[in-house]
């Protein structure tokens, strides 16, 4: 007689396999995100998604993973640490002549690596279930020798390996990965809208494996932010407009990565030297005192992007930009937006003749870039005329102190 698949045992195997594949944590949840739909719709209605039209276009599909892969019963959520050694947070942010790149983008693009590991996890599950199914089939054949077929009529149908279907996702489809991660017990959603884990902070990537097995689910973690609003008060542009709510239109990550056109002038002075993304809301978070370094070589910083001189980066032509950023998440913004972002950072730097000269040599490449170059030159000349001394914004002063005191390993 065939035995049903032991799903509890399989769930334990999945977590062990996941850790052997380099994931620091694996959790399992169902697909029900109906509670998230009103919040998602309200966020879209307020236009907080900015020019990311695909978010509005996909609408509530993001909260319905079972529609992405029909038949999906569970989501296997994983996290993988990405914080590199010697992250140089404070030393880079505190030097206006350097360019700050969000630490997730210093190494190779994470999408392919995580997707491949998730595919391997799915293959292991499939292989295990096939083996179990073959054992069951062998038992059933032995049993059939002793029992007439008619005696087995009416027995409940067992889940067989041939029915298993899975699909990996890594920030590559309309799916609410943070809500799923929270539901799967990976962590809780912080007020900056990122997932926090009490043992690992927030410096990790998320990935999902949708599967049609009714695996046992994990319990969510209790939210541990309490009254803390450090991320909200530290955000340079005030993008965290309410607890758990980010107005992407104000977020430096959106402005430097997702926005294709001109960066609104009101935000440019607030961007400082951040040229690709922003980590401030993570850097100030007390839970990141417990962050763990990555053990993935692919996430190690490329030397040319680690504490880079702005003028050196600004001198890259398109060929060099494409060559240096091959396999990097940075490449997706293209050379034009790369120069746009660096122009803003140069405009925020202390006056130097070499900065003005470098900006002037880039005139005429594109009208959008020209507009940022003219702004940056005007900022430089105004600073020279007043002999202005750089004055750090209160949020930045507080952030640098917090990093040096709370994250000395990564300062």
From Swiss-Prot:
Binding of [4Fe-4S] cluster 2 occurs at: 235, 251, 278, 281
Q: Which InterPro entries match?
A: 4Fe4S_Fe-S-bd (IPR017896), 4Fe4S_Fe_S_CS (IPR017900), QueG (IPR004453), QueG_DUF1730 (IPR013542)
Per the record, what are the reactions this protein catalyses? epoxyqueuosine(34) in tRNA + AH2 = queuosine(34) in tRNA + A + H2O
One of the entry's Gene Ontology molecular-function terms is:
4 iron, 4 sulfur cluster binding
Which EC class heads this enzyme's classification?
oxidoreductase
Q: Which SUPFAM superfamilies does this one have?
A: alpha-helical ferredoxin
Cellular component aspect of the GO annotation: cytoplasm
Q: Does the keyword RNA-binding apply?
A: no
Protein task: Catalyzes the conversion of epoxyqueuosine (oQ) to queuosine (Q), which is a hypermodified base found in the wobble positions of tRNA(Asp), tRNA(Asn), tRNA(His) and tRNA(Tyr).
Give the family from UniProt: Belongs to the QueG family.
Q: Biological process GO terms, please?
A: queuosine biosynthetic process; tRNA modification
Name it. Answer: Epoxyqueuosine reductase
Subunit-level organization: Monomer.
**Metabolic or biological pathway, per its Swiss-Prot or TrEMBL entry:** tRNA modification; tRNA-queuosine biosynthesis
Name the keywords, alphabetized.
4Fe-4S, Cytoplasm, Iron, Iron-sulfur, Metal-binding, Oxidoreductase, Queuosine biosynthesis, tRNA processing
Q: What organism is recorded for this protein?
A: Yersinia pestis
